[in-house]
Amino acid sequence: LDLSWSCYAAVNTVDKEILQKMGQAGCWNIFYGFETAVDELAKNILTNRKNTNLERMKQVAQWSREAGIEIRGSFMVGMPGETPELAKQTIQNAIDIDPDYAQFSVVCPFPGTQLAKEIKQGKWGKFISEDLEEYNTMKVTWLPFGYNSPEQLENMERYAYRKFYLRPSYILRRIAKIIKTGNITDLIRHIKGAIALVKGSYLIPISKKKETIKIKY
């Protein structure tokens, strides 16, 4: 069958042989939940951490490239126990793994999760919003003890995107690919993305106070 498909995967669920077969079967893109390779942070939030160190992540990324599969990766900032210095280590993880596209999200302690309960008990940090409408990974709804203000955490997410996407090596690689494919739509999309990165307009700003929908944890 002539199929083109994509999927999500964890780095400890694939190997070189599986990725080769996936590529041969039409898989063109895998979204990996890398999150972080900083052990000090991963142990606080990730339960299944076997074979999830930085070297494993880099190896899986290389196997994916060899199989002709595009790599998208998710990375987190604002993790329990995080400081700005540790967040920068996670950002460096992303650069070392070097996926085709990286998504940086703020940890969001959704109601009912173990993390939300622990924060409510005074562990890890404090909530800064109880508005259910604000609970997504693009908004800062809680503040780890390692940060001084919500703005500092929001700025860290902005820094992550700029640090990853505005690298000369990354820009040149994307330009080379666009020239090779001749995809004008892709070129326009990348230009708009670059402008948004410089302006910081790709993030949802911290909301002003308004009537909120209170959450019970």
Residue ranges and their predicted role:
Residues 1-182, 215-217:
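A structural motif corresponding to the C-terminal lobe/cap of the Radical SAM core domain
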Residues 165-172, 183, 187, 199, ...:
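Residue-level signal for secondary-structure boundary elements
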Residues 181-184, 192:
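Detector for C-terminal structural segments
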Residues 189-217:
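Short linear elements at protein peripheries
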